[in-house]
C-alpha cells in the first residue's frame, strides 16, 4: 500500500473515531428551502447522527447513529430504529430506492469489531426492505461505500478501494459484476446520478484539489465543474435536474473530509454554471453525504453540529 493511500485511510479512520467518541456534540437534522432560504430544524439530539435521506413519499428521513439506521418523521418526532439484522455497524453511506421499497447501506462486516473500533477495509453494501429486515449482500469485494441509486433503481454507484486507489464503480442493484467508472489517480468519491440518468456527478482530486466533476453514465467524458479555493464534496442533483447542492469546506482539506469544520452548502445552476451560497454551518463528514432532496425539489435535508 502506497504512502499517500495509507495517509488517506488514517485520516478517514481518525475522523470517524473523533466523532464517534465525541459525547459533547448536538446534532440537528434540518431542511433548507432553496426558494425562501429558510432553515427548519426537524429533529435534534445531544448525540452524534449523520446523513439524512428524504423518503420518496416525503414522509420520513433515514439517518445513521452509532452503527444503526433510524427513521425520523418528516414532521418531527421520535426516531425509530430500522432493523438491519446482523448488520449493526452501518456507516453514513445509505439511501432509499426510487420506488421507496428498499434501503441500501454500507456496513463494516467485521465480526470482531464494533462501530467505535471497526476495520475500515471490511465495508460492504447491503439492501433491506424499507421497513427493515434481513440484509442481502450486494458487493462481495471490500471496501465498498454506497452512494446512489440509478433513476430506474436497477444500478448502484459506490466508491471502492481497488488496486490501491479509490474510484467510482457501478453494480446491478441485485448484485453481480462491478464496473469501474473512473481510473484517475487520487480519490474519486461522492457520486450521484442526474435524474434522467445521463450524467453522474462526483468529487475528485484529479486536478490537485477536491472539486466537483461530472461524467457520462458509462464513465466517459469527465468534465470539471468547480474551480475555487474550497474543498468541494458530495454533489446531489435536484429532482428537476436544474441544480445540484454540494458541500464546501471553507478551508482546503486536501483529500480529507473531516467532521465538525466550518462549511458552506452551495447550489450550482446547471443551466448557467452560477454558484450560490445557501448557508454556513459546522459540519462536513455526516452533513450531506448522501442524496437528501425532498420529492418536489424545493428543499433538501442536512445535519448541522454544535460542540458543547
Language-model segments: which ranges?
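Short loop/turn segments that connect beta-strands within beta-propeller blades
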Residues: 34-37, 73-77, 129-133, 172-176, ...
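A short beta-strand motif characteristic of beta-propeller blades
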Residues: 38-43, 78-84, 134-139, 177-182, ...
